[in-house]
Curated annotation (Swiss-Prot):
PANTHER family: DYNACTIN 6, DYNACTIN SUBUNIT 6. The gene is dnc-6. This is Dynactin subunit 6. It comes from the Eukaryota. Subunit of dynactin, a multiprotein complex part of a tripartite complex with dynein and a adapter, such as BICDL1, BICD2 or HOOK3. The dynactin complex is built around ACTR1A/ACTB filament and consists of an actin-related filament composed of a shoulder domain, a pointed end and a barbed end. GO terms for molecular function: dynein complex binding. Belongs to the dynactin subunits 5/6 family. Dynactin subunit 6 subfamily. GO terms for biological process: mitotic spindle organization. Keywords: Cytoplasm, Cytoskeleton. One of its GO terms (cellular component) is dynactin complex. Its main location: cytoplasm. Part of the dynactin complex that activates the molecular motor dynein for ultra-processive transport along microtubules. The keyword Ribonucleoprotein does not apply. It is found in: Cytoplasm, Cytoskeleton.
Length: 174
């Protein structure tokens, strides 16, 4: 982990020391960051909401010069997913090897399938599923659930097997 003076992690958030955090990154309450996740905020800040899960080898990179990347609450970024979106809403599932390209925007309750892409500058409406080799879109009829049980399990088990990053409390002003 580098540049910890610009990293703020809430006290109830679990971050494994094998994660790499560069630049100004604020991670709010209840998130879980697995080993080998990369947060790269060298071009602009990354603000992460509550109760998100970032699985192994996920890469969250803000490529917009000086503009913040905002990630809402209760999202799951699965193994090897990549996100350079300017905005990700809440309750989204970003599948294994999925890619949110530079400057795209994902609203709430979206599901991005394995190996699917949301292309640069594309804006997804709420409850859109992206699936298949041609990145087809459709509207889903049910919203995504918050990953409450998965978060509880990970908060309990990860500290038993990994060293955790020391945190600084996020204040109300942030």
């Amino acid at each position: 982990m580098t540049d910890s003076s610009r990293v703020s992690i809430a006290t109830s958030t679990i971050v494994c020391v094998e994660a790499e955090i560069k630049g100004e990154v604020i991670i709010k309450e209840g998130c879980v960051v697995h080993p080998h996740v990369v947060f790269d905020a060298t071009n602009g800040p990354i603000y992460v909401g509550e109760n998100n899960i970032f699985e192994e080898f996920a890469v969250i990179r803000n490529n917009s010069e000086g503009q913040p990347m905002i990630i809402g609450d209760s999202n799951i970024f699965q193994v090897h997913s990549k996100c350079s979106a300017k905005y990700v809403g809440s309750r989204n599932v970003i599948g294994v090897h999925a890619h949110l390209e530079d400057g795209c925007s994902v609203s709430d309750d979206c599901s991005i399938g394995p190996k699917c892409r949301v292309f640069s500058k594309q804006n997804l409406e709420p409850s859109v599923a992206v699936y298949g080799p041609s990145n087809s879109h459709r509207i889903t009829s049910t919203p995504n659930l918050t990953p409450t049980l998965q978060l509880e399990f990970l908060r309990k088990i990860l500290p038993s097997y990994h060293h955790l990053y020391n945190k600084k409390k996020v204040t109300a002003a942030q």
